[in-house]
A protein has these predicted regions:
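Hydrophobic alpha-helical transmembrane segments
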Residues: 10-35, 55-64
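Generic detector of multi-pass transmembrane helix bundles and their immediately adjacent loops
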Residues: 32, 42-170
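Membrane-interfacial loop-to-transmembrane-helix junctions in polytopic alpha-helical membrane proteins
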Residues: 7, 11-14, 18, 81, ...
Length: 170
């Protein structure tokens, strides 16, 4: 019996909606952040744009390197937390991510807004119930991120449609 069969249809549909939202956040949030900050700054409200620019002022890396550093660090912490054989493993992963994020911001390696983007992406990936789908999303997220960095929204859209064509031919 599926767990969604044991609850009311309204709650089941709400859970499905949350999982679909988590899937899209996992796949597209880092790519959209890079595309908007690199190519489409006019879509950001002026006050928010000033806040993003001022937080990135002291960061020496381009935005793609900054994002890759944080995404790879998050994936390493996630894998490390899974390999610790006890109930304390996930707790160590969360505390490690908090400490690493705080240290990276204080050292001006990454901007605070990027910590928020990577955190939301990581939390959304935990809401995907199937391991193989979650793993696939982790890989495809990097592809969309590179396409967003290279071509903006156009690259993300092209990658999405190519991905749909590949999936429809399976």
């Amino acid at each position: 019996v599926c767990s969604s069969d044991l609850i009311t249809p309204i709650n089941s549909n709400l859970l499905k909606f949350i999982r679909i939202l988590a899937l899209f956040l996992t796949l597209f949030l880092p790519a959209l952040y890079i595309a908007i900050t690199s190519f489409h700054q006019e879509l950001i409200p002026t006050e928010l744009l000033f806040a993003i620019v001022s937080s990135r002022e002291s960061v020496p890396f381009p935005i793609i390197i900054e994002l890759l550093i944080m995404e790879i660090s998050f994936e390493l912490i996630r894998e490390g937390g899974l390999r610790i054989p006890s109930a304390i493993g996930p707790t160590i992963g969360i505390v490690g991510a908090l400490i690493l994020g705080q240290a990276a911001v204080e050292a001006s390696i990454v901007s605070p807004i990027l910590i928020i983007i990577v955190s939301i992406t990581g939390l959304a990936s935990f809401a995907i119930p199937d391991f193989s789908l979650s793993f696939h999303c982790r890989i495809v997220r990097f592809v969309y991120t590179f396409l967003g960095y290279l071509c903006g929204f156009l690259g993300i859209a092209m990658g999405f449609f190519i991905h749909l064509f590949i999936l429809s031919s399976i």
